[in-house]
């Protein structure tokens, strides 16, 4: 597998020639599109398999108590397939660090890296558990819309992200597209079963979105201020950082979710769940394995965009996939009155415009970098 490299620091960019910068930017764009594809593929597979699981498990037809069980299992599945990434981590090449700079960073650097991964592992386990519960209480669109608002706020205060008009337009289009065009989910209760003034539902709405948005911004901060500063990969951002972070964070989250699974006694229900599965135990196991692998595909794409661009951009792409996923769910399942009507068609158009706006902002930024370097080259040649 080819190594992916993030954008160069500004000082290093100025030492390059325009042709070299153009080549690096081309590689960067390819990396961005590959990570975006992984998010779209992961989102689609996760939602299709989740719907398949809840339909086959008869949860919507069962009593309310059983409908809200199994959330620790879902949280564990979201993180447990990280070992599949370990071979890719060792296959990927990485730049050799300077031994002197690494030795100077070793003592303090490793402690900072460990603290980062433990903190992120706790956050990921929290939002994995609460999202599994939250989507059973409130609509998928409300969850993700709240999530994007919080990610925007955290990006401004934690990552010091500078908003331009194209990014703001992208956020507005994304919020509208996701709120009106989110995919149907078989586990969501009917409107007559929900209470809009239920405090528990609102708390379950706020806490997972808060944990997810905070984790995205801390991941970006971790790449920029911790992993790069330790200089284990030189001064560059490389794709191996994504796999390292995903493996370590998922390991911590898996441990926490496993403890939760056994402490809650939920593990006792696994045998009954497999026996109730309409398609049988084989399809039950295959659906869980497929879900676990799909979550890893999604997570690698998400972390890749955090590394290459920002946590906010990763969230916009993740949410921009919702209308596409909604179309796939309509085609694959028959949920009462669920259809891809004018509202979702408008949401799909809004998602396209949202992504186009953000991509245009990135294109303008990259074009400006080349123009500045060309101007610098011309000034040097005249001197």
UniProtKB/Swiss-Prot annotation:
Keywords for the protein's UniProt record, in alphabetical order: Membrane, Transmembrane, Transmembrane helix, Transport
Membrane topology field: Multi-pass membrane protein
Pfam families: PUNUT
Principal subcellular localization: membrane
An individual GO BP term: purine nucleobase transport
Locations listed in the record: Membrane
Regions crossing the membrane: 30-50, 72-92, 113-133, 138-158, 166-186, 203-223, 247-267, 297-317, 322-342, 346-363
One GO MF term attached to the UniProt entry: purine nucleoside transmembrane transporter activity
GO cellular component: membrane
PANTHER family: OS09G0467300 PROTEIN-RELATED (PTHR31376), PURINE PERMEASE 16-RELATED (PTHR31376:SF41)
Family named by the database record: Belongs to the purine permeases (TC 2.A.7.14) family.
Name of the protein this chain belongs to: Probable purine permease 16
Gene assigned in the entry: PUP16
């Amino acid at each position: 597998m080819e190594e992916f490299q993030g954008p160069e620091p500004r000082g290093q960019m100025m030492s390059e020639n325009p042709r070299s910068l153009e080549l690096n930017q081309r590689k960067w764009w390819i990396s961005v599109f590959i990570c975006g594809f992984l998010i779209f593929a992961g989102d689609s597979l996760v939602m299709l398999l989740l719907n398949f699981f809840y339909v086959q498990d008869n949860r919507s037809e069962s009593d309310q108590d059983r409908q809200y069980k199994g959330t620790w299992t879902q949280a564990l599945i979201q993180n447990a397939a990280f070992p599949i990434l370990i071979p890719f981590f060792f296959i990927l090449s990485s730049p050799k660090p300077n031994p002197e700079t690494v030795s100077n960073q070793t003592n303090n650097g490793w402690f900072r890296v460990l603290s980062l991964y433990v903190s992120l592992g706790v956050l990921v386990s929290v939002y994995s558990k609460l999202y599994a519960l939250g989507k059973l209480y409130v609509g998928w669109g409300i969850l993700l819309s709240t999530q994007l608002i919080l990610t925007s706020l955290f990006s401004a205060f934690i990552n010091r992200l500078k908003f331009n008009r194209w990014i703001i337009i992208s956020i507005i289009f994304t919020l509208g597209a996701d709120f009106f065009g989110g995919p149907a989910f078989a586990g969501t209760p009917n409107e007559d079963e929900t209470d809009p003034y239920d405090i528990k539902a609102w708390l379950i709405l706020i806490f997972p979105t808060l944990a997810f948005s905070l984790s995205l911004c801390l991941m970006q901060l971790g790449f920029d201020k911790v992993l790069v500063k330790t200089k284990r990969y030189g001064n560059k951002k490389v794709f191996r950082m994504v796999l390292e972070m995903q493996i370590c964070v998922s390991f911590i989250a898996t441990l926490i979710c496993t403890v939760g699974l056994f402490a809650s006694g939920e593990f006792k229900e696994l045998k009954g769940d497999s026996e109730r599965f309409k398609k049988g135990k084989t399809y039950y196991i295959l659906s869980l394995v497929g879900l676990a692998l799909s979550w890893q595909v999604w997570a690698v794409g998400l972390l890749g965009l955090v590394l290459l661009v920002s946590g906010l951009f990763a969230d916009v792409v993740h949410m921009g996939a919702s209308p596409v996923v909604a179309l796939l769910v309509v085609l694959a399942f028959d949920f009462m009155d669920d259809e891809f009507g004018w509202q979702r068609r408008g949401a799909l158009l809004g998602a396209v415009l949202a992504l186009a706006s953000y991509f245009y902002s990135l294109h303008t930024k990259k074009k400006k970098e080349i123009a500045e370097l060309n101007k610098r080259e011309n000034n040097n040649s005249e001197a």
